[in-house]
Amino acid sequence: MSQIFNFSSGPAMLPVEVLRRAEQELCNWRGLGTSVMEISHRSKEFIQVAEEAEKDFRDLLKIPSNYKVLFCHGGARGQFAAVPLNLLGQHGKADYVDGGYWAASAIKEAQKYCTPNVIDAKTTLNGLRAISPMNSWELSDDAAYVHFCPNETIDGIAIHETPDFGDKTVVADLSSTILSTPIDVSRYGVLYAGAQKNIGPAGLTLVVVREDLLGHARKELPSILDYTVLAENDSMFNTPPTFAWYLSGLVFKWLKEQGGVGELDKRNQAKADLLYGTIDSSDFYRNDVAVANRSRMNVPFQLADAALDKLFLEESFAAGLHALKGHRVVGGMRASIYNAMPLAGVKTLTDFMIDFERRHG
């Protein structure tokens, strides 16, 4: 079978080395004669998996010791509710930065629990979609926290600035960027990410929370979303998604073998440069996001003649380039190039794009 490159926005491509190891171990994990999916989450064997995964994740992100790491259910949408219910305390207000679809979704959920101060950061620059700089955001003095999403997967818009808001508690949805570039965890109060883009399969959510933010949950908060309950029970208040946890642990080890987040950051930049360079050098393709706010993970692009979209998708799929159809809100194409996507995959895509333009432009 020829090489297939999966450009899905999530669930996304996983490292082939990880998939092969999981395949080898699937029915007889560590010589136990059973699958890792079948053993108790409280067995010493799985506890070792869980502890190794947390240690590797901490090493990769350089997480300070005064932060808890939680392995949760519920995805980012679950965290849209968990964040306000855990952090608001007696506050009635939180700052929410609206940079696109997912930020707006977090705002909609937060409105059930508080009155968000919404900062609309969407703007245009020379006719291109952009995000206003952080120093222009009008934050509240009395907000419990400020929430933003650094990367909008649908719009292909990213906020590359590092937050510097003094002593404000900063919360970030890193679902599509986690482990793709180094970050200073100490700048944040809470980080959360669905696993299905840069970590592992769907079903697992990672939360990193500063310890001083624990213990302030609203009384109506379900225990399964309570950061304090999860921390006190080592993320095993109920049965966790064990197979997703195991596979994510394999991905963490793969990332360390590749050289860590710093090395992946270089690779991700090279992939993005190649793809955007191909788009920008052509009149046949276009990207409508200002250069300073272009996403390195999700690259939307349109053809000059939308009537060719269907043919582009058919021919690219036949060439082993899968899941390139853009989101219905934006249209066109979208290439998601997370950590597991090799440079060779992006090169295959750009070669196809150049050839398609030659034949149909």
Swiss-Prot record:
Subcellular location(s) per record: Cytoplasm
Positions of L-glutamate binding: 9, 42
Coiled coil: none
Record function comment: Catalyzes the reversible conversion of 3-phosphohydroxypyruvate to phosphoserine and of 3-hydroxy-2-oxo-4-phosphonooxybutanoate to phosphohydroxythreonine.
Species of origin: Erwinia tasmaniensis (strain DSM 17950 / CFBP 7177 / CIP 109463 / NCPPB 4357 / Et1/99)
Signal peptide start and end residues: none
GO molecular function, one term: pyridoxal phosphate binding
Cofactor(s) required for function per UniProt: pyridoxal 5'-phosphate
PANTHER family found in the cross-reference section: PHOSPHOSERINE AMINOTRANSFERASE
Superkingdom of the organism of origin: Bacteria
Family to which this protein belongs: Belongs to the class-V pyridoxal-phosphate-dependent aminotransferase family. SerC subfamily.
UniProt name for this protein: Phosphoserine aminotransferase
PROSITE patterns: AA_TRANSFER_CLASS_5 (PS00595)
Annotated positions of the N6-(pyridoxal phosphate)lysine modification: 197
Pathway the protein contributes to: Amino-acid biosynthesis; L-serine biosynthesis; L-serine from 3-phospho-D-glycerate: step 2/3; Cofactor biosynthesis; pyridoxine 5'-phosphate biosynthesis; pyridoxine 5'-phosphate from D-erythrose 4-phosphate: step 3/5
Cofactor note: Binds 1 pyridoxal phosphate per subunit.
Key words, A-Z: Amino-acid biosynthesis, Aminotransferase, Cytoplasm, Pyridoxal phosphate, Pyridoxine biosynthesis, Serine biosynthesis, Transferase
